[in-house]
From Swiss-Prot:
GO terms for molecular function: ATP binding; ATP hydrolysis activity; ATP-dependent DNA damage sensor activity; damaged DNA binding; single-stranded DNA binding. Can catalyze the hydrolysis of ATP in the presence of single-stranded DNA, the ATP-dependent uptake of single-stranded DNA by duplex DNA, and the ATP-dependent hybridization of homologous single-stranded DNAs. It interacts with LexA causing its activation and leading to its autocatalytic cleavage. It comes from the Bacteria. This is Protein RecA. PANTHER family: MITOCHONDRIAL DNA REPAIR PROTEIN RECA HOMOLOG-RELATED, RECA. Its main location: cytoplasm.
Length: 369
């Protein structure tokens, strides 16, 4: 009987290894196109670019000056914590830079008047109010694959109701439907987002797990897929009510970057959300300017470059709002001092110890997976 042919590949040796690799690469390039496989050192792509959040503190916490382009971002937190406000500010910044934005309003709760106050060009904003979760994610996928969208916001994951649940009876069990829907959609969208350079912001809600004895009982809706596919996850919480006398005028809000694949994680940003006005960029510029020695504070007086800005933080905030050129100048100095965005040193960023850079870390809140 003839010997059975051995179908196992034999390891190449010596010069044959390079020849075998070159032949395989040539075949892959022929079948799948140029660039299907490349050496990492030959990749001449620029550093990850970002869409500004519109707030200096958030841009600093994200590490690259904003939300990364071509990636998935999850913004979650309790009700009325400022999640949609953060996303709308990012849309406004993308539009100011000449980009096109889309908003998938699964909650059917978008307020156009409030969006306009935050700087969103509502006439140019693409809005969809889908009937089902499948329809919402299919529309989002088609917009991303067009290659024309710079940022797309899905508000919210919890409202992406599967078609079977909508058509079913009240009380019917639909275990895992939404999780499977999200998992399939994210598998499809991830590559398209990277190729088109579109930033996708998924707004999510919190739920509580029953029977948890240790650790946080809080979890997000939609299964685990979004946790894995997201390059950045932001936990947004309201920590204080801002008052003018007895009247509430806004909220002090904390954003914690609990996962970050493009910069060291666990950084925290605190900022003010003023009612009817949105996130106060000027307030964050004052806070970071003082922290980094760019703005000098003596008692209640604030001084910049030898000139007095005013007495009291609120007066200085209003002054910076009336002089945006000065606010831009101070913000640029903050980014330069902290090496954020275009001022980042890419080589140093890979060797920095994130624990040394971020005070008061609570590793029990979230993992970085």
């Amino acid at each position: 009987m003839a010997a059975k042919k051995n179908s196992k590949s034999q390891p190449a040796t010596g010069d044959n290894r390079q020849k075998a690799l070159d032949a395989a690469l040539a075949m892959i390039e022929k079948d799948f196109g140029k660039g299907a496989v490349m050496r990492l050192g030959d990749d001449n792509r620029p550093p990850i670019s970002a869409i500004s959040s519109g707030n200096t503190a958030i841009d600093v916490a994200l590490g690259i000056g904003g939300f990364p382009k071509g990636r998935i971002v999850e913004v979650y937190g309790p009700e009325s914590s400022g999640k949609t406000t953060v996303a709308l500010h990012a849309i406004a910044q993308a539009q100011r830079a000449g980009g096109i934005a889309a908003f998938i309003d699964a909650e059917h709760a978008l307020d156009p008047d409030y969006a306009r106050k935050l700087g969103v060009d509502t006439d140019a904003l693409l809005v969809s109010q889908p009937d089902t979760g499948e329809q919402a994610l299919e529309i989002a996928d088609m917009l991303v694959r067009s290659g024309a969208i710079d940022i797309i916001v899905i508000d919210s994951v919890a409202a992406l109701t599967p078609k079977a649940e909508i058509e079913g009876e009240m009380g019917d069990s639909h275990v895992g439907l939404q999780a499977r829907l999200m998992s399939q959609a994210l598998r499809k969208m991830t590559g398209a987002l990277y190729n088109s350079g579109t930033t996708a912001i998924f707004i999510n809600q919190l739920r509580e797990k029953i029977g948890v004895m240790f650790g946080s009982p809080e979890t997000t809706t939609g299964g685990k897929a979004l946790k894995f596919y997201a390059s950045v996850r932001c936990d947004v919480r309201r920590i204080q009510t801002l008052k003018d006398g007895q009247d509430a005028i806004g909220n002090r809000t904390r954003l914690k970057v609990v996962k970050n694949k493009v910069s060291p994680p666990f950084k925290i940003a605190e900022f003010d959300i003023m009612y009817g006005e949105g996130i106060s960029r000027e307030s964050s510029i004052i806070d970071l300017g003082v922290d980094n020695g760019i703005i000098k504070k003596s008692g209640s007086w604030f001084t910049y470059d030898g000139d007095q800005l005013g007495q009291g933080k609120e007066k200085v905030r209003l002054y910076l709002k009336q002089t945006p050129e000065l606010a831009d100048e101070i913000e640029e100095k903050i980014f330069r001092a902290l090496q954020i965005g275009k001022y980042a040193n890419q080589n140093d960023a890979l060797t920095d110890d994130p624990v040394d850079m971020v005070p008061n870390i609570d590793f029990d809140d979230e993992d970085n997976g």
